[in-house]
Amino acid sequence: MRGDLFRLRPGQESAGHEQRGPRYAVAIQSDGILLATLIVAPTSTSAQAAIFRPEIELDGTRTRVLVDQMRAVDASRLGDFAGRLNAVETGEVDRAVRLMLGVL
């Protein structure tokens, strides 16, 4: 599951600068921790570049993983499976998570 990409089903209303609308998300939670929720990071094709927003390719389109907006979502919000990060992308997301949480 970790590193998998899913289409997110619509959830509660967003506020402020939170992402809204249809989008994909990357599962970033450890496979060793099974809960009714899953920690994900949404993606965006229009977000500004930042060292904590690694780029990945999804269906031939470059998109950014918004590690700065990672959150727990109920497993029922996971829609269709959309792919899996490759080893390089997984490493870049891991680095961004460590940077965002200050655990480098």
Question: PLM ranges: what are they?
Answer:
Residues 1-104:
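Conserved functional hotspots at enzyme active or ligand-binding sites that engage polyanionic ligands
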